[in-house]
Amino acid sequence: KLSNKKIQIKKSKIFFKESNSTKDVVVLSTISKSSLFYDKKVNANKVNIEGSIYNTKYNLSLLRNTNKKNTTDDLLIKLKKLNAIIKNEFVSDENKKNSYSGKASINFSGSEINTIYRKDDKLIKLNSEKSRLNNYSFDFKGEIITSPFYYNLVVNLEVINVVKMIESLSKLKNLVDKKILLNPNLNGKITFNINSLKGIKFFDGAKIDLKVINGKLILSNSTLTSYKIGKMFFTDSVLESVDNKKIFKSKILFKISNQKKFYQKLLISRPYRIKLNNVYFEIEKDLNNNEVEIKKIILNKKIVDNSSNKSIDLSNLIDVNEIKELKNWIELKKYSNQIFFKISKLN
C-alpha cells in the first residue's frame, strides 16, 4: 500500500534486468514525469508515468486493487507514435508463487488483438480471443519463456488484405528503427498461416516464418502460394542492422508448376513464351529509403531437379527504375510482355 500523499518523480530512468545481476540490461525506459499514490475511493495503488522506451513515447497507468483476496492489476499503455493502446488485467495466484492469469488487448490501426494467458514461473501460455487484424478475424496460440526470453507463436489467418497490411506495417516501421524487433535480447519465432490473400493478383495464400535471433529478423522458409501456378520460396532472407542502416536481403525462388496458367495470368503472347520451370531473384533493400537493388534475376535456375531447360540471366536486362514506375496490374502485364519479347530474341 502506497502513501495517501502523491509521490512525484521527474526526469528519471528505469533499467529492466534479468534476476541474475550479471545479465545485460533488457529494457531501458526514460521517465519525463510520474506519480505514485494510494487512492482511498477505489482502495487501490495508482501509478501514472509519461516516458519513452526505445525512443517511442508512452503513457502508462497502473491500478493495483488491494481489497480483494487475490491481488488484481489493471495496466493501460498508450504508444503515441504507433497509435497503439495496450491494456492488461491480471490476477495473482496467492497459492502459487510467481503465478497469475489474465487478459491482454492491443489496439492499433483498426486491428484488435485479445489474449488470454496463464503464467507459471518462467512459462507463459497464451491463446487468442475474438481477435481481428484489419477487420478480419484470426486466432493464435503459443508460449513465452521469460528467462532466457524466447517466444514461439502460431497465428492462423483466414483472410488478409495485403494492401492494408503494408499500410499498417509502414506505421510500425519504427519498431525496427528503434531496435525493438532487432533487439538481441528479444529472440523468438512467429509462424503466420494465411489461407487467403486479398488485394494481390498473383498469390492466393502464404506461410510467413518469422524468426528474431540475436538482433536479426529472418524470413527464410516463408512461402507464397498460387494454387494454379506454383509456389514462391524465400531463402537466406534476413533483415539486420548494418552500419546503422536497416538492410533487408533475400533470395527468392518461384517454382512454376503450371507454365500455361503462368503465361495466361500475365497475358504473355504465345511467340514470346519459353519453357519455364522457375524464376530466381536476389534482392536488397535499405528500409530508410525506397531504393531496391535487384542483384540477380535468373530464369530456369539449376536446382536439385537438374532441369535441362536453358538458364537465362536477366540481371542486366531488367531496369529496376522501370519496375518502380509500374502503377497497376495492367502495366505489369505490359512490362512482362516486353521482357519476354527480349528473351525470345536471345534464344
Model-found features: residue ranges?
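Membrane-proximal interfacial segments on either side of biological membranes
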Residues: 1-347
